[in-house]
Curated annotation (Swiss-Prot):
Produces ATP from ADP in the presence of a proton gradient across the membrane. The catalytic sites are hosted primarily by the beta subunits. Keywords: ATP synthesis, ATP-binding, Cell membrane, CF(1), Hydrogen ion transport, Ion transport, Membrane, Nucleotide-binding, Translocase, Transport. The keyword Isomerase does not apply. The keyword Cytoplasm does not apply. It holds the Pfam family ATP-synt_ab_N. GO terms for molecular function: ATP binding; ATP hydrolysis activity; proton-transporting ATP synthase activity, rotational mechanism. Belongs to the ATPase alpha/beta chains family. CDD domains: ATP-synt_F1_beta_C, ATP-synt_F1_beta_N, F1-ATPase_beta_CD. This is ATP synthase subunit beta. It is an enzyme of class 7 (translocase). It comes from Clostridioides difficile (strain 630).
Length: 464
């Protein structure tokens, strides 16, 4: 017989539900269902507050709910469809399709709350994941099965970079991607679906959205829905999966809204006291096992460009690589606007990427760092006051800066330039030649938005 309770209080997205006795109280994280006309509203148990009552977070709008309504305990957490039937489809936090097509019939279902893999299941070898994006592969390479943060303020190109990564991984590696849209613009989700359908990448991708207009409960759990789908591809099919989360900050933001509604004391800057725990529960499930891997790329919105804010700061501690997008670089018209000095990776290590790659990357960074130091002198005294050695460093640094730019396939319709995928070997060779001074005679404009070093030479010849 179904375990039934009654709604006794509704405060925004938070409901209190009273059951008959303590024995019939649903477990924490159980899904409860309320029938409202022909719709079902699902809520998740968050607290036992005494007096046979549980406090729950609704996963959809609570409009139309009234006290006294019947609530049925499903007996388990929210479960979502997984497997091949989810590819090419768009789902919400509950695993219900929102693309107007019928629900997957035979897809197995898994609960969104699951333990992280055990220690003895983890894979410990480090391997680089080639992205075909020069600045990323050279200076902050991605670890296969690692966690990567894309940091940047509003409008510096986080979403475009994510779309290019999905495109490159699907086309070059044939890998499966899962995209979790967490609290971002619905329009962007729609654009992403359209672009992926056009480029044919959609058949290798499952999309899950809990966008800005949805209640905090949905935004807080939608990352787990996407992660559960990715885990199935890793564990059951042995796939190397890419999990995109856009935006992980909204996950924290939704948690902070829910926390306040649940009556918890806020901690620093008004965030939830359980911030580190919630982030850890999500991040520890994203890992490589002996069966397959989940490589996660997470866009991290940085409130007011402040990297010390608790939300981005908590995210930092989980990451293997960080790609920092800079407004200063985008203002120079260099895209992707990745900051070559702020972006780092744990695997930029000669024992993993090789001695040549490591030395070229460090050489590029040291020249750019010296150029940064000289900029004040140039601004005050001008280029003529520099020594010949410093003039050469500035000239090479400006070429390197421009050679770090690249045309993206997903931006082709806006720029008119065809996108380029540059293998790591070509990237390292190109920058090595610039460092060695082989292209000191070329104008710096030849290096902007080209792929390989040969493209730059051809562009220079064409403009002469």
């Amino acid at each position: 017989m179904a375990n039934v309770g009654k709604v006794v209080q509704i405060v925004g997205a938070v409901l209190d539900v009273k059951f008959d006795s303590e024995q019939s109280l649903p477990n924490l994280l159980n899904a409860l269902v309320i029938k409202l006309g022909d719709k079902e509203i699902v809520a998740e148990v968050a607290q036992h507050i005494g007096d046979d009552t549980v406090r729950c977070i609704a996963m959809s709008a609570t409009d139309g709910l009234v006290r006294g309504m019947e609530v049925v305990d499903t007996g388990g957490p929210i479960s979502v469809p997984v497997g091949d039937e989810t590819l090419g489809r768009i789902f919400n936090v509950l695993g219900k399709p929102v693309d107007g097509k019928p629900a997957p019939k035979s897809a197995p279902k898994l609960p969104i709350h699951r333990p992280a893999p055990a220690y003895d299941e983890l894979e410990t070898t480090a391997e680089i994941l080639e992205t075909g994006i020069k600045v990323v592969d050279l200076l902050a390479p991605y670890l296969k099965g690692g966690k990567i943060g894309l940091f940047g303020g509003a409008g510096v190109g986080k979403t475009v970079l994510i779309q290019e990564l999905i495109n490159n991984i699907a086309k070059q590696h044939g890998g499966i991607s899962v995209f979790s849209g967490v609290g971002e613009r619905t329009r962007e989700g729609n654009d992403l679906y359209g672009e992926m359908s056009e480029s044919g990448v959609i058949n290798k991708t499952a999309l899950v959205f809990g966008q800005m207009n949805e209640p905090p409960g949905a935004r807080m759990r939608v990352a787990l829905t996407g992660l559960t789908m990715a885990e199935h591809f890793r564990d059951e099919q042995g796939q190397d999966v890419l999990l995109f989360v856009d935006n992980i900050f909204r996950f924290t933001q939704a948690g902070s809204e829910v926390s306040a509604l649940l009556g918890r004391m806020p901690s620093a800057v008004g965030y939830q006291p359980t911030l580190a725990t919630e982030m850890g529960a999500l991040q520890e499930r994203i890992t490589s096992t002996k069966k397959g891997s989940i490589t996660s790329v997470q866009a991290v919105y940085v409130p007011a460009d402040d990297l010390t804010d608790p939300a981005p700061a908590t995210t930092f501690s989980h990451l293997d690589a960080k790609t920092v997008l800079s407004r200063q670089i985008s203002s120079l018209g260099i895209y992707p606007a990745v900051d070559p000095l702020e972006s780092t990776s744990r695997i930029l290590d000669p024992s993993i990427v090789g001695k040549e790659h490591y030395e070229v990357a460090r050489g590029v960074q040291s020249i750019l760092q010296r150029y940064k130091e000289l900029q004040d002198i140039i601004a005050i005294l001008g280029m003529d006051e520099l020594s010949d050695e410093d003039k050469l460093i500035v000239a090479r640094a400006r070429k390197i800066q421009r050679f770090l730019s690249q045309s993206f396939t997903v931006a082709e319709q806006f720029t008119g330039n065809p996108g380029q995928y540059v293998p790591v070997k070509e990237t390292v060779r190109g920058f090595k030649e610039i460092l060695e001074g082989k292209h000191d005679d070329l104008p710096e404009s030849a290096f902007l938005f080209v792929g390989t070093i040969e493209d730059a030479v051809r562009k220079a010849k064409g403009s002469m």
